[in-house]
Amino acid sequence: MNIVAIISQKGGAGKTTLALNLAIASELAGFPSAIFDLDPQASSMGWKDSRVDESPAVVSLHSARISHYLETARQGGAKLVIFDTAPHSQKDALEAAQVADIILI
């Protein structure tokens, strides 16, 4: 399973848009994906709630639960996990960066 963290301290930089598009492209290519929404604004969750399709999976969580949800995603067959981080939360961004294979800034 590959893990990507999208990090920027600026709001409105396109982190959520990039996360959603990467996850959709992964799904269309046949690789199940999940988005972990670490932003309290929960824009990825809002997008998910407006959709009928169940994939890609989107989970809103706090950084303290990252390990648990990574294992759940792994057991569920996810090939790609994307962290959509908040612009103001250094702690959550750092936690995501520490477990990521790729960090997009």
Protein language model features and the residues they cover:
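P-loop NTP-binding core
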Residues: 1-105
